[in-house]
Amino acid sequence: MRRVVAGAFALGLVVVACADPFAVEPRQAAGPVIAAVGDIACKSLPNDHERRCRYNRVAEAIREMAPDAFLALGDLQYLHGAYEDFIAYYDRYFADLKDITHPVPGNHETYTLYAEGYYRYFGARAHPPGGWYSFGLGSWHLVALNSQLCKGSTWTPELGQRAPITTSPAIDKGCGPGTPEYEWLKKDLVTHPARCTLAFMHHPLFGSEPYPEGVFLYQLQPLYELLDEQGVDVVLAGHEHNYQRFAPMDAFGHADPDGLRLFIVGTGGDTYGDLPEGEVATNREAAQDRSFGVLRMVLGDDEYSFEFVSAPGEREF
């Protein structure tokens, strides 16, 4: 279940092995293709603004990849994840991808009570009431997590109160040991001891932003610890509106060749999120904040290849 990277620390194509610690030459893996990105649709139609609302280009990039699965990494419809906004904006460009979409909710989806717009739009694909689930793709095991549950509730401006964030109030209890999501994840990973495993959620445990919500990140850490303990290879997240790739590390941010490799792919077309100038996050291998685009991964039997693909009309990296 573990991995060693091969290739340069660039945004281009590299291959990683899930098991034995040996390097291979940069090349394309053979297997199912996934596209992954979050932080997508503005509450307005696409435009040519320099920094925002170009999610139509991202949808086009995904279609050109013809992936077997699209992992939608949360904050899919701004500002509040209302069902009417999903229909008016997100659906206009992503409807034909719905049958291959595997979504997770972000914080903006949960600004509507019980994330009603998100669960209504995606239906069974969102796996209510909790929003966590797993599935197989090729030889890989993929796990979708609801990281917003780690807060236990979310601030909803319209309601002026803390509001539940799933369709079942009984589930809004956080994500640490003893909670429904944590215990489900623990059992799922033991039940599916795949050679290669990928987890995806909206929130990254590490990144570039100086989060003001440290308590929330503390609550999120148990999920990452469990993923690391169970030998998960890759974690995909969004939330920060840029692209970042990290070297393997443990759940405390320490470099570890047997740790989790984290990708942050918040380049779905809503807005750019500036990376702090002159600051390099610990263990970060690559990053960019000036191109909307998609992470393309090929999931081989014992390895995977990955590359960041800029959307049509965006700056190439």
Each model region followed by its residue ranges:
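N-terminal active-site segment of His-dependent metallophosphoesterases
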Residues: 22-85, 180, 187, 208
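Residue-level marker for buried hydrophobic side chains located in beta-strands
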Residues: 34-36, 70-72, 103-104, 199, ...
